[in-house]
Amino acid sequence: MTTQLTHLQQLEAESIHIIREVVAEFDNPVMLYSIGKDSAVMLHLARKAFYPAPPPFPLLHVDTTWKFRDMIEFRGRMAKESGMELLVHVNEEGVKRGVSPFTHGSALYTDVMKTEGLKQALDRYKFDAAFGGARRDEEKSRAKERIFSFRSANHRWDPKNQRPELWSLYNTRIKPGESIRVFPLSNWTELDIWQYIHLEEIPIVPLYYAAVRPVVERDGMLIMVDDDRLELKPGEKVEHKSVRFRTLGCYPLTGAVESEADTLPEIIQEMLLTRTSERQGRLIDHDQAGSMEKKKQEGYF
């Protein structure tokens, strides 16, 4: 008797196959852990792929020093629970220069603290493959990227030089110094992610659930006041609203949405009615036309 897999089971099986393929083919893989919902699902899949042993690779978090406090607390808890080594890398040169989203703008800040920080970490530990939680439905440049995304020795991505991926066969050959970025969640949608989190009871950062939080309206977005480093501009005032986050990043660059959805079923119901991208709340995606693709070509994930 043939068992018919559900949609989520098919996605799960594909992702686990990809994760195992990387471990079989590469010498020194790593999983980028950004602490968001996609990272939570990816970590869960990795643990399933190698259960009862822990995944045979470490977690890497590129810390910009501007993450939400709830994210940092959650990061430590999940690393301990998974039994995996957690590597945290900070671009100390950027810290010494005082680079921040307020003083240097989102584009330069992202380049220094995220892109350069990531490249430093990959070079330092000599990783030849790095898992990421990006999905094709998030953004147009990610929509055309392969699951196994080739990067040069300078960590650059050339969208015109991508490898064919037919019948779940992946070309993993690289020269010394080159690497591959791997996206096991490429074919998942935001709704798939939420339904899987609900089905598997995967822990996520509390910021995804609606709650009354201090926010300030800035450039058409609701920015949460997470610590005293957020300086108010003339005319701005802190308000307390029921909000949640569809996507998580650095708190000064991540907009909240007004919502009353404080349970997973309510979030899923809200998702069914939403017609905008989750990354609409990420300021770094609006720096310039083709912003994300330019960042990826320079080494961003």
UniProtKB/Swiss-Prot annotation:
It catalyses: sulfate + ATP + H(+) = adenosine 5'-phosphosulfate + diphosphate. One of its GO terms (biological process) is hydrogen sulfide biosynthetic process. Keywords: ATP-binding, Nucleotide-binding, Nucleotidyltransferase, Transferase. It holds the Pfam family PAPS_reduct. Its EC number is 2.7.7.4. Pathway: Sulfur metabolism; hydrogen sulfide biosynthesis; sulfite from sulfate: step 1/3. Belongs to the PAPS reductase family. CysD subfamily. Heterodimer composed of CysD, the smaller subunit, and CysN. NCBIfam families: CysD, PRK05253.1, PRK12563.1. This is Sulfate adenylyltransferase subunit 2. It comes from Geobacter sp. (strain M21). The gene is cysD.
